[in-house]
């Protein structure tokens, strides 16, 4: 007799629904007003390896300016809600707000192509493990003067928030684990904001060299006490609202030029089953240093593989934010190591006619040149209750910036108000009712500020990027038709042709 019984398999519940993130195209309406904005020529000069103090005061400090630093520009735009628009009926200030949308960008780079080298006068190298025939002599200090050319990198990231970087640093042990000074420290993965002046990943890894390499001779001078950061593309691509990276362009290339090993006591001995011991008393009785480390090289630079000095048009961003500049700000992150030439400057200390090396003083400087151009589109947002609630959940400071606030509940208590506020007979009244000032979320960070509040124009055809935008948009100047009158034809008497008679 057949008998029904419930299945023995597990019952799987449906997954918990996630909150849906809307694309900006669903609640942002684009207008047909476009503006051009461009910076002035942006220049910076400094020492390529370190910050130098040559005297007292701020002007006595020579900043560190290297071709292997991030340049993070914080572009500030005017408030479009305070604009005098050509059409007063374009938007309703009671129910709508205006925002900027980035539609085009061109990052201009001046200066010729060049390769800038870095190095260390006391670089930790023991053997040339590629071409050596004999081991180096055993001594306490085998450091040498080595210079390298770093990995070649070109990078452009555009967003309304600064980019996110990643690097490795020294971690912390558990409380029950007894730390030993001879053990390798634990590593910790960290996400930090990439700021202007941070060092890029040069081929030695994205790590905190100051805390993980205490000898200060494992890498060149400009990074031996710095942190090299690498953009966390995975984190920025997975960002819910897509504010950190509208789009990015990158090009990297590197090869290993020299192969060295490190000098020092091996912190972790090789397992004995990986090698056979040499003859007792010989140089190869015990294996030498197996800490191998190559030196990077970025190879040739060429104008055929340049990412800069050309326009880019934003039609669809990779995230949910399709180019909307919240809080009227835009962050442009640039890395270009193909123009990293370091100037060697020489001055004579005496007027001697013969050359003597000690009579000259040598200096190093590095210069950079930038030019930023943008095309912005004016957009508006219909502030319905649903959209306002969504924007408040996305960023609660956005509505406050638009002068929309949440009204406090009505108070039933009776408040006190003094007549003489400056009187010493009453308690101090300072700060009792003063509103809290707006706090800049990036006040403690370093960026290169580019102010475009007075540099926007609707005359796109008067600027190079504006003409390129009009050309790709299909707008062309109208050709003036010149009417030319044709001269009246002169009447000629028709000539009668006679036929020849056939015989």
UniProtKB/Swiss-Prot annotation:
Self-assembles into homopentamers. The capsid has an icosahedral symmetry and consists of 72 capsomers, with each capsomer being a pentamer of L1. Interacts with the minor capsid protein L2; this interaction is necessary for viral genome encapsidation. Interacts with protein E2; this interaction enhances E2-dependent replication and transcription activation. GO terms for molecular function: structural molecule activity. Keywords: Capsid protein, Disulfide bond, Host nucleus, Host-virus interaction, Late protein, T=7 icosahedral capsid protein, Viral attachment to host cell, Viral penetration into host cytoplasm, Virion, Virus endocytosis by host, Virus entry into host cell. It is found in: Virion; Host nucleus. The keyword Transmembrane does not apply. Pfam families: Late_protein_L1. Belongs to the papillomaviridae L1 protein family. Its main location: virion. InterPro entries: Capsid_L1_Papillomavir (IPR002210), Capsid_L1_sf_Papillomavir (IPR036973), dsDNA_vir_gr_I_capsid (IPR011222). GO terms for cellular component: host cell nucleus; T=7 icosahedral viral capsid. The lineage of its organism: Viruses, Monodnaviria, Shotokuvirae, Cossaviricota, Papovaviricetes. Residues 475-503 are annotated as: Disordered. Forms an icosahedral capsid with a T=7 symmetry and a 50 nm diameter. The capsid is composed of 72 pentamers linked to each other by disulfide bonds and associated with L2 proteins. Binds to heparan sulfate proteoglycans on cell surface of basal layer keratinocytes to provide initial virion attachment. This binding mediates a conformational change in the virus capsid that facilitates efficient infection. The virion enters the host cell via endocytosis. During virus trafficking, L1 protein dissociates from the viral DNA and the genomic DNA is released to the host nucleus. It comes from the Viruses. This is Major capsid protein L1. Transmembrane segments: none annotated. GO terms for biological process: endocytosis involved in viral entry into host cell; virion attachment to host cell.
């Amino acid at each position: 007799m057949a008998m029904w019984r419930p299945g023995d398999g597990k019952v799987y519940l449906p997954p918990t629904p996630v909150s849906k993130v809307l694309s900006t195209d669903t609640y942002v309406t684009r207008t047909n007003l476009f503006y051009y904005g461009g910076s002035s020529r942006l220049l910076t000069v400094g020492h390529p390896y370190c910050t130098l103090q040559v005297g007292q005061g701020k002007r006595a400090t020579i900043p560190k300016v290297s071709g292997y630093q991030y340049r993070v520009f914080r572009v500030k735009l005017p408030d479009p809600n305070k604009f005098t628009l050509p059409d007063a009926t374009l938007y309703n200030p009671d129910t709508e707000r205006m925002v900027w949308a980035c539609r085009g960008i061109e990052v201009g780079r001046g200066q010729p192509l060049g390769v800038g080298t870095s190095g260390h006068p006391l670089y930790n190298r023991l053997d040339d493990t590629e071409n050596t025939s004999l081991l180096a002599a055993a001594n306490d200090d085998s450091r040498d003067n080595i210079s390298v050319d770093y990995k070649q990198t070109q990078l452009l990231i555009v967003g309304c928030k600064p980019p996110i970087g990643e690097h490795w640093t020294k971690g912390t042990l558990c409380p029950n684990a007894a730390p030993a000074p001879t053990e390798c420290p634990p590593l910790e993965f960290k996400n930090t904001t990439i700021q202007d002046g941070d060092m890029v990943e040069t081929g030695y890894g994205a790590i905190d060299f100051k805390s993980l390499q205490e000898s200060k001779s494992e890498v060149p001078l400009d990074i031996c006490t710095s942190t090299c950061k690498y953009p966390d593309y995975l984190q920025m691509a997975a960002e819910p609202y897509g504010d950190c990276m509208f789009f990015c362009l990158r090009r990297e290339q590197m090869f290993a030029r020299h192969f060295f090993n490190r000098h020092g006591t091996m912190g972790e001995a090789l397992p004995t089953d990986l090698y056979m011991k040499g003859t007792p008393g010989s140089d190869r009785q015990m294996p030498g240093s197996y800490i191998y480390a190559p030196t990077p090289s970025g190879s040739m630079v060429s104008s055929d593989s340049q990412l800069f000095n050309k326009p880019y048009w934003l039609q669809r961003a990779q995230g949910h934010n399709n180019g909307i500049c919240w809080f009227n700000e835009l962050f442009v992150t640039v890395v270009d190591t193909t123009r990293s030439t370091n100037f060697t400057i020489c001055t004579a200390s005496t007027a001697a006619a013969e050359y003597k090396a000690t009579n000259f003083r040598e200096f190093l400087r590095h210069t950079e040149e930038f030019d930023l151009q943008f095309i912005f589109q004016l957009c508006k947002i219909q502030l319905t209750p649903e959209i306002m609630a969504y924007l408040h959940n996305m960023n609660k400071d956005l509505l406050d910036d638009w002068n929309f606030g949440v009204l406090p509940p009505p108070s039933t208590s009776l408040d006190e108000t003094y007549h003489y506020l400056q009187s010493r007979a009453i308690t101090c009244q300072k700060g009792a009712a003063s509103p809290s000032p707006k706090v800049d979320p990036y006040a403690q960070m370093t960026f290169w500020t580019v102010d475009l509040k007075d540099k926007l124009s609707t005359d796109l055809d008067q600027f190079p990027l504006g003409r390129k935008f009009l050309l790709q948009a299909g707008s062309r100047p109208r050709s003036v038709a010149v009417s030319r009158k044709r001269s009246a034809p002169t009447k000629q008497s028709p000539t009668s042709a006679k036929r020849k008679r056939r015989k």
